[in-house]
């Protein structure tokens, strides 16, 4: 996974990538640390690029996307939010949404 360091980088992704996953985390978040490797393993099964952001380092992204809890997983497709989960990630549901997106491509 690649790190997003600023809001402009995120905007560029929206413009250039058809489909991608964004994982938002915060420092000292034990759930974030536990879920991160699971997200990495899951996304390897698909050909979607994946990015992560430390929500404290990019406050503009946090505000623009209403990312007020962590962890958060958002799937983007065609420049729009397709699916979002926050705090408690339902990996079965996330997998279903990734499958759904993989057939759309």
Predicted regions and their residues:
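Short acidic active-site motifs
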Residues: 6-10, 57-62, 93
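Non-catalytic, surface beta->alpha helical segment in thiol-disulfide oxidoreductase systems
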Residues: 77-105
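Thiol-based oxidoreductase modules, predominantly thioredoxin-like and allied folds used
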Residues: 4, 24, 43, 47-60
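Hydrophobic beta-strand anchors of alpha/beta hydrolase catalytic cores
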Residues: 20-22, 50, 73
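Local sequence-structure signature of Cys/Sec-based thiol-disulfide redox active-site neighborhoods
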Residues: 9-41
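CheY-like receiver
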Residues: 12-13, 61-64, 82, 97
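N-terminal leader/targeting and pre-domain segments
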Residues: 1-20, 97-99, 103-105
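Structural micro-motif
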Residues: 65-74
């Amino acid at each position: 996974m690649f790190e997003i360091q600023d809001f402009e980088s995120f905007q560029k992704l929206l413009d250039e990538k058809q489909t991608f996953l964004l994982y938002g985390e915060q420092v000292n978040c034990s759930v974030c640390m536990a879920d991160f490797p699971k997200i990495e393993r899951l996304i390897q099964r698909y050909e979607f690029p994946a990015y992560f952001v430390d929500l404290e380092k990019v406050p503009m992204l946090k505000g623009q996307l209403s990312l007020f809890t962590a962890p958060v997983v958002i799937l983007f497709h065609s420049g729009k939010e397709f699916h979002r989960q926050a705090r408690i990630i339902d990996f079965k549901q996330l997998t279903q949404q990734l499958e759904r997106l993989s057939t759309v491509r």
